[in-house]
Amino acid sequence: MSTYLLIDTSTSRTSVAIVGDGKTLFASHHDGALSHGEALPELVAQGLKLESRIDQVIVGMGPGPFTGLRAGISFAQSFALGRGISWQGVCSLDAIASQISKSDFIVAVDARRKEVFYARYTDGSRIGEPKVCQPSQLAVFDIPIYGEVSNQYPDPTAFIAIAESGAIYSQPIYVRRPDAYPAPIGVKFRPMNQLDLVPIFSIERSAYGKEAWTMAQLKEESAGKDRM
């Protein structure tokens, strides 16, 4: 049987598992919405110490915030390419739904910007594609809601069964457009410096209110390797 490297970075949690011959050989995670890029290689390295033979990679394709999602997908694709093996993508919400035994329910995860990504499941099957809305709008369904809000995250060990069912994705499930857009013609760029943090903080607060990063978070992010 094949040995799988399973990765998910669609939520604030970075999750990695290695499953071989139907047994979970490694499973670990790291919590932190801003640390996917740093945590993922470390978790994979830990897993490879226990099982270095990987036949296939399966990665959660979202929906999820753009930056974290891309960290996992890019890593999975690069790892597979480097080893000359195949990779597949699955819906991360399906891996939360696999943990729920109810017959009719919603799975919702934080989409930031005061929104959630969600999907409805009936008798174990997802109804349509994932969507995005404000949390208060989910009340109209009048059915149980599970997911990140109740401390439930995608279980990567469920990815194998999901992929085998044929519910695979070759492109990220963004649901909404990324926050980044092509630059207007004629705009010039320069490296960011510490003096820019004050106006950046002001813009962040104006745009996102209570959801905005704190000055401490901005300083920590800007001080990271290759940030400026």
What kind of feature is each model-predicted range?
Residues K188-I200:
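A short beta-loop-alpha structural element at the N-terminal edge
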Residues S206-K210:
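N-terminal first-folded block
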Residues M1-F26, D31-A39, Q88-G186:
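Oxyanion-binding and handling regions
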Residues S222-M228:
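A short helix-loop-beta-strand connector motif used in the catalytic cores of GNAT acetyltransferases and
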Residues V44-Q56, V140-D142:
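Phosphate/pyrophosphate-binding loops at sites that engage ATP/ADP/AMP, CoA/4′-phosphopantetheine
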Residues L40, E211-E220:
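A short, aromatic/hydrophobic, helix- or strand-capping loop or linear motif
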Residues F201-R205, L218:
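Hydrophobic alpha-helical core bundles mediating ligand binding, dimerization, or RNAP-core interactions
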Residues Q56-W87:
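DPxDG-like acidic metal-binding loop motif
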